[in-house]
UniProtKB/Swiss-Prot annotation:
Signal peptide: none annotated. Keywords: ATP-binding, Kinase, Nucleotide-binding, Nucleus, Serine/threonine-protein kinase, Transferase. InterPro entries: CDK, Kinase-like_dom_sf, Prot_kinase_dom, Protein_kinase_ATP_BS, Ser/Thr_kinase_AS. The active site is at D208 (proton acceptor). Serine/threonine-protein kinase involved in transcription regulation. Phosphorylates the UBC2/RAD6 ubiquitin-conjugating enzyme (E2), leading to monoubiquitination of histone H2B and the silencing of telomeric-associated genes. Also required for histone H3 methylation. Necessary for the recovery from pheromone-induced growth arrest in the cell cycle G1 phase. It is found in: Nucleus. One of its GO terms (cellular component) is nucleus. Residues 409-428, 457-474, 578-598 have a biased composition (Polar residues). ATP binds at L61, G62, Q63, G64, T65, F66, G67, E68, V69, K84. It comes from the Eukaryota. Pfam families: Pkinase. It comes from Kluyveromyces lactis (strain ATCC 8585 / CBS 2359 / DSM 70799 / NBRC 1267 / NRRL Y-1140 / WM37) (Yeast). Residues 477-486 have a biased composition (Pro residues). This is Serine/threonine-protein kinase BUR1.
Amino acid sequence: MSTVNKKPASLKYKIGKVKQIPTVVKDDKTGLEYIQVQSRENEKVYGVTKFLNNYREEEKLGQGTFGEVFKGIHLGTNRKVAIKRILVRAEKDLFPITAQREITILKRMNHKNIVKLIEIVYDESPTPKTDSTSPRPVGNYHGNNTANQQKLITGKHFFMILPYMVSDLTGLLHNPRVEFGMADVKNIMLQLLEGINYIHCNKFLHRDIKTANILIDHKGVVKIADFGLARNYYGSPPNLKYPGGAGSGAKYTSVVVTRWYRAPEIVLGDRHYTTAVDIWGIGCVFAEFFEKKPILQGQTDIDQGHVIFKLMGTPSMDEWGLAYHLPGSELTKTNYKSTLQERFSKALNETGLDLLSKLLALDPYKRVTAMKAKKHPFFFEEPLPNAQLTLPNEECHESDIKRYKSEMNESMSQRPPSAPTGHTSTDNSIRAVTGAAFPKEASIPKAPRPEHIKSTIPAQPSASRYNGAATQNIPKEPIPTAPLPKGPKNSIPTGPNKLPPNPRDSYASKYPAESRFGVNTRITTESYNAGKRYRNRGGWETGRDSLNYNNNYAPPADRSHHPTIQRPSAPRGGSYPNRYQNQDYNTSRNTGYNQYSQAGDRRSYRPGASENPGTIGHGSSQSTQKDSKSSHSNNVKPKDVADYY
């Protein structure tokens, strides 16, 4: 028994229940490609009910080449949805081929990080709509040409119903009230890599990765949207062995991807690109978190190549040899050095910079894949990615950027005027009048604020100060003029009256003992200044250790009230003690306090350094008092001077 081989039925390209002729029609004026749509009589288009009976359009969210996106409500469930209107040519029932690709690809996608296509809706009005009579915006045209409006406005409308997302990444980055921490950035990047890896493993190219196409719902889940430029990829799916994926040999158009997110191989005119073009866009999004704006803003296609090489450096033959054989190889004659590390070193550590450099590798076959980028050490170091992303209680979309800018301008205009900074010198005023360069250094320096002065003082005095030990490297601080609080012995003052800690403070300086003459001889400013003047005139011995003097000695403010204390007259030729530099004097100066040395028929008084370094002040009980039994001349100090000092 023989069987007859029947020819298999020809597969017809279908979307829903609409049969389509696989003939692509190209518009001569715009260069856009369409598919001619033909349906049978009395056939329900796309198998759904009429649009007006199920959905209601509200505000406009965005606009694209082939349609507009609105915020809408499903009347049956009162659920918010996003309605994407697809432009249809009226004269020949032409359906955009990019919309057809987007619909077919979204129907095959099922991932948490990819936007879900709910349904396709068809609405047909009996008469063509116009902008003035239609209750909702129809058509997508540019300019004010009435003829173009009539071509684009038609009675047939196709709508893609998508879940409504409260925010997109562009709106969040431009919102001044939103700040992303590093843990939030890692959370978003991991979700983005998960979604793009799913797309590549299913052998598709997105070809329009940018912040405006990255949506985030109210639960913090990232969704990749806008598959209008997506298409099938005929190469092998990416894997861990080949970083940039294997090329398929198929030619693709180079007019894809928004210019600022366009990969360098597309900029140089390569049409045999791979899935690495989407990885470059993810690298641009990653860097945009830290500058709040696109990092590669080229004005033209040629300028875009210069901007890329200024950031990553001009590639050599070893780094990217294919670049010298592409149509745009003229850009390789530049000589730029990479500025990536210098530009982002403040925001990223070495691990983060390594991930960014691999995402933005110039050679597409050396560029990291999404599968491998997910395992980068950057995502496994502190701070770890947040388990759930937290968003503000407001909607943030790309259409809100103008509102954010106006809010910033209003807040700046409502600020009070700044305080005057003072007048400039006459010389600078003459320069300003004559047109000479006005130096910035000419402004009057501002006095340091109290907190600046306080910050230079250590938090607490050194421990050696409480036991009286001398420290040689203690900075000299100005003596406070405020009255010091008095307290009990062996205690430290507390409460609001406590002064800032001073490294030169000791118990003796905090609670000074009044002298036998009723004058504070240790800490008062007047006594300090008076003693300093008196010492400079030679009244005090210059051989005294300056550090011990500054720390432990202070002469009285007025010595005239004590008749027994008189300033010794210094002999001609120098201060009083320095004239008597003999062996007896040098020997006696180191034996203790209040020692006298015999020098001829004159006596010199020299208080030597204390042998006990822990002694505080001159009136210590450890220093022995010795009276001189020899006769004194008029230039000899009385013996009770030692008691005073």
